[in-house]
Amino acid sequence: MKVFHLLLRRLTFTLLSLSLLIFHQSAPAETRLSGNHFLSAELLNLSKDLTMNPIALWLDQGSQIWQKDCQGCHQDLTQVRQSIVEFPRWKNHQLINLEDQIIQCFAKKQMVGLSTENQDVIALSTFLSDSAKGLKIKLQPPSEVAERKLWQEELNHGAQIYIQRQGRVNLSCTQCHDLNIGKNLRSDVISPAFLTGFPIYRQSWQTMGSMDRRLRACYSGVQAAIPPTGHRDLRALELFLKNRSEGLLWEGPSIRR
């Protein structure tokens, strides 16, 4: 009987995961609203004011890093723009996101031991994210059959995390970001979980933060065990969120309360 219930639970997770994937992939892009649609008038004005938007500080720093450490290899920024909207990507049998790629590139220049939230990493991520603004989000699954199967397993894993109740609060991602869109939670307006603009500047952080930091904050909010930065669960969840955002326009680094 235990085995039967376990199999039934897994089947339920699989069916729910597939239904989420199919629903969001089939929904027209114009019917899906990004987080920017739910900003207060104050934050929306701040995001549009280039003289006051704090993200400009990280853009300037990222531009300097690009010219100093990256331009010699990549030359034209337009050559890397498209790849920004394709992360997380499959590399060496695992998922990596934009910050992972930056850390790997820095390591080649003997800049080792950097974390995802390192200010140089975040600044360059902010600059590159901004360069891809306006492009359509489009993932690039691996072409090789065996690798594609592993990639799909990670996507399914992310979908299961999304619908799994977490922590002492016993909430799942879908309960907030699909079933309670537009409602207030701790002074924040709940938006759909479409990944269209990162890194983000959160006023409550007073700094820029990566997707990892935002997801880990959600784990903390529901009082669940928090995965370490770069954990497989975080990458799989990011892949799922990016997958359901396919077809939407990338908005670049964003501001939140």
Identify what each model region corresponds to.
Residues 3, 7-8, 17-57, 89-156, ...:
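Post-cleavage N-terminal segment of exported redox proteins
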Residues 50-78:
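N-terminal, post-signal-peptide region of Sec/Tat-exported proteins
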Residues 63, 129-184:
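Surface-exposed interaction/gating patches
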Residues 64, 158-163, 172, 185, ...:
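Long compositionally biased, domain-poor regions of proteins
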Residues 68-78, 124, 158, 170-180, ...:
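The canonical Cys-X-X-Cys-His
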Residues 80-84, 183-187:
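Short Cys/His-rich "knuckle" micro-motifs
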Residues 85-93, 189-197:
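Short cysteine/histidine-rich metal-coordination sites, predominantly Zn2+-binding motifs
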